[in-house]
Amino acid sequence: MATPSDEAVERIKFIEQRLVDPSTVGVFQAEVIKFDMKDSIQEVLKISGEKEILKLPLYNGNQFSGLVTSRAIAKWLQKHIQNNNIELSGTVGELLDFEKKSQYEFIPTSMTIYEAWRLYQTSPKKLDALLLTENGTVEEEIKAVITYDDLLRYIYTHDQYVFN
């Protein structure tokens, strides 16, 4: 009769714990820097560069208007280069014209890490981000902007027993 190693027993216990009480996306809650449609492009680029933010939630007052990605910023910059200079005048709301639509989903804080992971895997659209709110609705305050890389990093560092 085979006796399981201590490592095998530890791994089984870990997997059981993850199945019984899975981690939720609430672990990603952090301060989210939001921008208003009327903010200057120059100021937004400065802040996003300093804070290394690649996904920018945009609001019109208190109403969510969209998510701008670094891809849209690059497209905007390409269209505004003249004589090897880029004029940074304008508002961040103009960036939405360079952004594809529906590249994000709102999700509730109660969603498990693996449900969020599955969303990235099964969504018919290529998601750029999951926007975390208390109940997963657009009307609520965004508590986190979760990328595919964020989930992958979390799973790899916290759930390595599941994948090894």
Feature-to-residue mapping (PLM):
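Charged interaction/catalytic cores of defense and host-pathogen modules
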Residues: M1-A2
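A structural micro-motif recognizing beta-strand termini
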Residues: D36-D39, P108-T112, N135
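Tandem CBS (Bateman) regulatory domains
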Residues: A8-E31, T69-D128, V145-N164
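Glycine-rich acetyl-CoA-binding "A-motif" of GNAT/NAT acetyltransferases
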Residues: F64-L67, E139-V145
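Short loop/turn microsegments at loop-to-beta-strand junctions
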Residues: I53-L54, D128-L132
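Core beta-strand residues in small-molecule sensory/regulatory alpha/beta domains
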Residues: Y59, T133-T137
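Acidic (E/D-rich), amphipathic helical modules within compact regulatory domains
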Residues: K34-D39, E43-N84
